[in-house]
Amino acid sequence: MIQEKAIIIGGGPCGLSAAIHLKQIGIDALVIEKGNVVNSIYNYPTHQTFFSSSEKLEIGDVAFITENRKPVRIQALSYYREVVKRKNIRVNAFEMVRKVTKTQNNTFVIETSKETYTTPYCIIATGYYDHPNYMGVPGEDLPKVFHYFKEGHPYFDKDVVVIGGKNSSVDAALELVKSGARVTVLYRGNEYSPSIKPWILPEFEALVRNGTIRMEFGACVEKITENEVVFRSGEKELITIKNDFVFAMTGYHPDHQFLEKIGVEIDKETGRPFFNEETMETNVEGVFIAGVIAAGNNANEIFIENGRFHGGHIAAEIAKRENH
C-alpha cells in the first residue's frame, strides 16, 4: 500500500489547480486520472471555442496567452499540459479509482485499477462530463444515438437530429451544417435559451430562417428507430421524420453513486453534495470536493473560471490542520 499526503481524484483544470495550491503549503498531492490530463476538454468537439477568455482559465499563475480573447480546445490542451510540466504535478494517468474506504483511524484506502493507496485527505474533482442525462425514450440505446459531438465530417449528406437547445446543441448543429448534413433541431423549450453564446446565435437564427436548419420548439422526442425519429410538437399530433443519426445534447450530471459510496450526503432535489463552502469539505471529514461536482445537477453554476479557486479553500483548511 502506497502512502500519500493527499490524493486528488480527477485531473481536470480544477483538480490540477487544487494540486498546485497544495504544493504551496508543502503537500505534493498525487492526481489520479482515468484518462489523461484535462480529459473532458480532450473530449470536447474538435473545433470548440471556449465561453471564457483565456485569462479566466489560468491556474497556478501560469499565463495563458492566445491571439484571440477566447481560446480554442487545442490551445487549452497545450496550456494545461504545460502547467503540469512546469509545476511538476504528479499525475497517474489512465488509472481508474474503483473504491474509496474510510478507515477507523480517519485515513482513506483508495483502490484503483493499478494500485492501493492510503491518505488522510481525499479531494474529489471528477467533474460531470462522463454521465449524460438520458431521455429514457425507446431507441435511445441504438448505436446511431450519441451524447457527445466531436466533428461534422462523418455525417455529410445524412439526416441528423440534434436534441436540445443550448450551446452544445447549437454548436453541433452549425458544425453539422458546415459538413453538409441535413439538420433538424428538436428543443422542448419554446424559445432560444438565454445561455446560448451571443456571438453564435445570429448565425444559427439566419440558417433557421432560410430553411437550412429545421428548428422545432416545444418538441418532445417519443421514440427513435433505425431510420426515423418520432416526436410530439407542442400539443399537436406525432411527427415522424427520416433520420440517420441523433445527437442527444441533453446535458450531463455528476457521479452521485461514487460520492454516496464514500458516505457523502447528496441533496436529492439539487444533486448537490453537502459541503462547507468555506473549506469545500463534505460531511465526511477529510473528503473535499473541487470543481463542477460541487454544483450538483446545475452544471451551469460552476465553470473552470470559478472552480479553479476551490483548491485554495481546500489547501487553507488542510494547512490549518497540519499546523496544529
UniProtKB/Swiss-Prot annotation:
Residues recorded with modification S-bacillithiol cysteine disulfide? 220
Protein's UniProt keywords contain Isomerase: no
Q: Any idea of its EC number?
A: 1.8.1.-
From what superkingdom does this record's organism come? Bacteria
Q: How is it modified after translation?
A: C-terminal Cys can react with bacillithiol (BSH) to form mixed disulfides. S-bacillithiolation protects Cys residues against overoxidation by acting as a redox switch in response to oxidative stress.
| The UniProt record lists the keyword Oxidoreductase | yes
Q: Looking at its record, which EC class is this enzyme?
A: oxidoreductase
Keywords of the record: Flavoprotein, Oxidoreductase, Redox-active center
Essential cofactor(s)? FAD
What the entry lists under Gene3D superfamilies is as follows: FAD/NAD(P)-binding domain
Q: What GO molecular function annotation could you give as one example from this UniProt entry? A: monooxygenase activity
Q: How does it assemble?
A: Interacts with BrxC.
Q: Which NCBIfam families match?
A: Bthiol_YpdA (TIGR04018)
What does this gene product do?
S-bacillithiolation is the formation of mixed disulfide bonds between protein thiols and the general thiol reductant bacillithiol (BSH) under oxidative stress. BSH is an equivalent of glutathione (GSH) in Firmicutes. This protein is a NADPH-dependent bacilliredoxin reductase, which debacillithiolates (removes BSH) the S-bacillithiolated BrxB (BrxB-SSB), and to a lesser extent BrxC (BrxC-SSB). Involved in a redox cascade increasing the efficacy of BrxB function by reducing BrxB-SSB and thus reactivating it.
**This chain belongs to which protein, by name?**
Bacilliredoxin reductase Bdr
Q: What is the lineage of its organism?
A: Bacteria, Bacillati, Bacillota, Bacilli, Bacillales
